[in-house]
From Swiss-Prot:
Matching InterPro entries: WRKY_dom (IPR003657), WRKY_dom_sf (IPR036576), WRKY_plant (IPR044810)
GO-annotated cellular components: nucleus
The protein's name in its UniProt record: Probable WRKY transcription factor 69
Residues within the DNA-binding region(s): 64-130
């Protein structure tokens, strides 16, 4: 028994000396540090809710999609999703006036009163308010474009009226008392007075065609004789041998005359 007690005491002393020499492992210290989670701090974002009647919103559509009212900031829509418990979706917008601006807003219809829009603003703009000169310039440009478009339409209407009146009114100096109604010639209405010379010529030709032909033939023969005299006036008389040609020409002329006189009673008999 005495020996067993001495052995146990020696073992206890060795254990104590080992614990004093060997330090604690570093892994146990790291585990103790990792096991303690550090709480993350969430930054508090101030939100501001504004309700606007849909009747006052410009650009509202009847199909259900509603655009938010203009608040002098430039916004760009980057998403939309349905809301649980509401038949209306929610639109997400971010500020596009300046690159990197954290300002955001959410637009949706109110569940209680669907005739109103609920606009929730989050974060503040990190850039100055857009100058009013830019807004006035854009407004001025739009107004100038509208004015020029209206002026062009008015000019076109005036030109159309002028063309219509010019087509309807006859030219000055024409006597159209004998005309009953206009005729459609070449796709547009024109009075007979413009072609009065043609109308008169047709009437005169139908009534006295024989007189007209006689006058033209006489003028033609007289002109031909004058030209022959002017051309052959310097030539002398032909010799006696040329009488043969003269007799031949006289004979042919007599034959033509006989044929003409013989054709007249033949035409009368056919009638």
């Amino acid at each position: 028994m005495h020996r067993r007690a001495a052995i146990q005491e020696s073992d206890d002393e060795e254990d104590e000396t080992y614990n004093d020499v060997v330090p604690e492992s570093p892994s146990s210290c790291e585990d103790s540090k990792i096991s303690k989670p550090t709480p993350k701090k969430r930054r508090n974002v101030e939100k501001r809710v504004v309700s606007v009647p849909i009747a006052d919103v410009e650009g509202s559509k009847s199909r259900g999609e509603v655009y938010p009212p203009s608040d002098s900031w430039a916004w760009r829509k980057y998403g939309q999703k349905p809301i649980k418990g509401s038949p209306y979706p929610r639109g997400y917008y971010r500020c596009s006036s300046s690159k990197g601006c954290p300002a955001r807003k959410q637009v949706e219809r109110s569940r209680v009163d669907p005739s109103k829009l609920m606009i929730t603003y989050a974060c503040d703009h990190n850039h100055p308010f857009p100058s009013s000169s830019a807004n006035t310039k854009s407004h001025h440009r739009s107004s100038v474009v509208l004015k020029t478009a209206k002026k062009e339409e008015e000019y076109e209407e005036e030109e159309e009226e002028l063309t219509v009146t010019a087509a309807e009114e006859p030219p000055a100096g024409l006597d159209l008392s004998h005309v009953d109604s206009p005729l459609l010639l070449g796709g547009c209405y024109s009075e007979i007075g413009e072609f009065g010379w043609f109308y008169d010529a047709s009437i005169s030709s139908s009534s006295g065609s024989s007189n007209f032909l006689d006058v033209t033939l006489e003028r033609g023969f007289s002109v031909g004789q004058e030209e022959d005299e002017s051309l052959f006036g310097d030539l002398g008389d032909l010799p006696d041998c040329a009488s043969v040609f003269r007799r031949g020409t006289v004979a042919t002329e007599e034959q033509h005359r006989r044929c003409d006189f013989g054709a007249i009673p033949f035409c009368d008999s056919s009638r």
